[in-house]
Amino acid sequence: MTNITSVNTLVSASKLTCIREERILFDELSFDINAGDIIQIEGPNGAGKTSLLRILAGLSRPYAGQTFYLNEDINRCRDEYNEDLLYLGHLAGVKSELTAEENLNFNLRISGYDDFDTAAILAKVNLAGFEEALAGHLSAGQHRRTALARLWHNDCKVWILDEPFTAIDKKGVEELEQLFIQHADNGGCVILTTHQDMGIIKDDRLRKIRLDYRFV
């Protein structure tokens, strides 16, 4: 992973424009996301929050504008960026036919990790005793925690998370917030969407980007 101890700005957006079905979701949106930042993307349903996250992750192309990682266009440093990026969409990305342990093992190995204790990691998300349970038999909250477990064994600098608190109880949300703070304090950044209020991450620590769409 990239050593960024001397680099402050991790991800930058320059004049990003996104248009969907004759609606301008956002227009010439520019901002810098620095090491230590926790960023919440806000806006009504349909405002383009998920679209913006996907553009920042390099999974979708904007109508106009550019996204940069360490001041280089992500299209020119794709491999380096992907190594330092963890993206979790609003869908859990968990295979129902695999156990919780198998899902975590799969997700960590495809991310390049080979030295980890799946049982210990699952215990951190309150899934101790459910290691061998098929994901398809888990509750919605357990399903989501299975997806989120990889955050507890990850050294990517950039975390992009779409609705990470969905189906998570209050205690679980607080544990995630603490993890986000720890990740930011260690020089990473967290970019997320959520419809829930956060209790631990206060406004003086949280930066917000507001989206409001309009018709062309």
Curated annotation (Swiss-Prot):
Gene3D superfamilies: P-loop containing nucleotide triphosphate hydrolases (3.40.50.300)
MF (Gene Ontology): ABC-type heme transporter activity; ATP binding; ATP hydrolysis activity
Location(s), subcellular: Cell inner membrane
Pfam families xref list: ABC_tran
UniProt EC number: 7.6.2.5
Entry coiled-coil feature ranges: none
Disulfide bonds: none
Annotated ranges, domain ABC transporter: 11-216
Membrane topology according to the record: Peripheral membrane protein
Keyword tags: ATP-binding, Cell inner membrane, Cell membrane, Cytochrome c-type biogenesis, Membrane, Nucleotide-binding, Translocase, Transport
Presence of keyword Cell membrane: yes
One example of a Gene Ontology biological process annotation: cytochrome complex assembly
Gene Ontology terms: cellular component: plasma membrane
Known partners and oligomeric status: The complex is composed of two ATP-binding proteins (CcmA) and two transmembrane proteins (CcmB).
Protein function: Part of the ABC transporter complex CcmAB involved in the biogenesis of c-type cytochromes; once thought to export heme, this seems not to be the case, but its exact role is uncertain. Responsible for energy coupling to the transport system.
This protein's name: Cytochrome c biogenesis ATP-binding export protein CcmA
Name of the gene this protein is made from: ccmA
